[in-house]
Amino acid sequence: MIRILLLVDCANDFDRNLLRGIVRYSRENGPWLFYRLPSYYRSIENGERSILEWAKAWKADAIIGQWNDDAMDLLKELNIPVVLQNYRHRSTTYSNLTGDYEGTGLMAARFFAERLFRNFAFFGVKAVSYTH
């Protein structure tokens, strides 16, 4: 059985739908065994290092989730597939869970333009990837 460590919050709809999709995929292609760590895992003693040691002890086959950019090199020690859901930067080393942010913006602009809105704007947070 494949062991997947999930480092995903479930505080918003995107995350809950992501978890539902992962479970649905596992039912069709599994069996997979999941372990989800809560969002406070980053604040425990030794932070990401503790998670890394836990993943090794549990013999995780893959990780899906959010990870601190500053600790990205730690994941290489595991030598397993990693899929990152990172809002600040896209990883050039690992697979990314991300969206077509430009396409979404274009879709929104067309929606408003078709309704004859001529002045509209986007407000985003500079530090997150979807704003770029």
Predicted regions and their residues:
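Short glycine-/small-residue-rich Rossmann-like dinucleotide-binding loops
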Residues: N68
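Redox-cofactor binding/interface segments in oxidoreductases and associated redox assembly factors
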Residues: G65
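Bacterial carbohydrate/catabolite-sensing allosteric modules
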Residues: M1-A62, A71-H132
